[in-house]
Amino acid sequence: MPHHTASAESTGTAATRLAVRLLDAWSARSRAEPAGAELPSDPGVPVLAALLYATGDPEAERSAARAVAVWARDAGRGPAHCGLYDGGLAGTLVGLRLGAGVHPGLTPVADRLRDHLVRTAPTLGHRREQVAFPDYDLIVGPSGTLLALTAGTSPTPAQLGPFADHLTGLCDADALPRLRTGQYAGHPNLGWLDGRINTGTGHGVAGVVTALTAALRRLGPAPGPASGLAPALGRATRWLVRQSFDDARSIRTWDGAGLDDAPPPGGARARQAWCYGTPGVSWALWDAADALGDRETADWAAAAFTSLAERYDERFHLFGDRPSDLLALCHGASGVLAVADAFARHAALPAAAALRARLLTHLRTRLPEVAALGATGMGLLGGAAGPLCALLTADHDAARTWLPCLGLR
C-alpha cells in the first residue's frame, strides 16, 4: 500500500527530482565519455528510468526516455559474461526488459538476448564441485541469470530449466558439499572462503535459495524436470538454519561462511545487509519456506528478521569508508530498506514495517549524499540508482518488477 503522508509525498517528489537530475547528468556524461568508470551493461539506469517513467510526470518521462536511449546504445558491451552484475549479460537483459516499458522497440532485443542466455547455458561448463562464484552465485553466476529471466516477464519452464536444473544439482546433499568453494586458495581477498561454503545472498547459499524459490514459484513441485526443486530447496534452507546463531546483541545472524560444526566466534556482527547477515539470509529463508508451505520455517525466519529489526543500530550496522557502504543496496541502508519492505508487504511483519519507516527517514535526510554517490556511479547494486529505486518502491509505491534483481518481490 502507498504511504499517503506528507513526508512520503514530499520524499517521493524529492526522490523523483533527484532521479531526474542524476539521470540527465548520467546521460550527458555517457555521451561525452562512453568509456567511463561504469560497466555499460549495469541495469541501474534503465531500472531507475522505468520507475521514473511510470510516474507520469512529463519531465521525468523525458529524462527516462533519454537515459534509456543512451544506455541501450552501449548495452551488452563490456565483460559479457552471463551474470546479473559486474557487466554481465543477465544485467543487460533486465535493463532491456524494463527499459522496454520506456522504449517498446527494446522488447525484441530483450527476447533475443534471453534466447541466447538460455541456448548457451549448457555450454558454460559450470563446475559441480570445488566451485567458484561464477558456478552458482547471484552476482555473476546462474542464480542471478535465473532471477534476471523473471524480471518484468513470465519465463517458460524451458527457459528456466537449464539454470534451475544446475542449481538443483548443487543442492543434492544435506551438507551442500557441492557449494564448498575450491578456487580461492591464496586469493588476496577471498582466501578466507577457500574450502568453505558462503552463506550470503550475493555470493552464497542464500542467493541460490532465492533463485530456487523463484523457479519453484513458476515451475511448481509437479513431477517432471522440476521435480527435484522442492527437495533441493528444503535441503538448502535447513542448511542455512543450522549455520545461524545469536550474536552478542541477541540478533539471530550468520557469518560470511558456514560454521563447519565449530562454535561461532564471540561478539556482535556489524555487517547486517542485503549481501551478508540477517536481512538477506532471513528473507531468503522466509520466502523459500512460504513457497514450500513450511509455516514453521517461515515463522522462524520472520523471528530472525525481527531480532534484527528490533535491535538495528544505524551507528553500528552501517559502516565503511565509501558512500556506497552506507547507502547502496549491497552493503548499505537501502538494501536493508528493500528487505524490510518485502517482509512488511509479504509477511505482514510489524517489526519490518517499523524498520522500514526508520530507514525511510534515514534515507530521506541523506538525499544529498545519494546525489554525491550518483556523480560517480549510477549502478544498481553499488551506485545511486539502488537507493533511489528502493525509496521510490518502499515510499512511493513504484513497480516491484525490478526486485528479482535482489531475490526479492
Locate each region found by the language model.
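Terminal, non-catalytic domain-edge segments
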Residues: M1-A32, A214, R218-G220, D287, ...
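Internal, well-ordered domain-core segments that constitute the primary functional module
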Residues: V94-H166
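Solvent-exposed loop and edge beta-strand segments that line ligand/cofactor-binding
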Residues: D24-P43, A72-L89, R127-I139, L190-A206, ...
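Long, well-ordered core segments of solenoidal/helical folds
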Residues: A14-E33, R62-P79, P108-E129, G161-A185, ...
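Helix-coil-helix junctions within alpha-helical repeat/solenoid scaffolds
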Residues: R271, A284-T297, A301-D313, D321-A328, ...
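Well-ordered alpha-helical scaffold segments within catalytic/enzyme domains
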Residues: M1-A8, G44-P58, G91-P104, G144-P155, ...
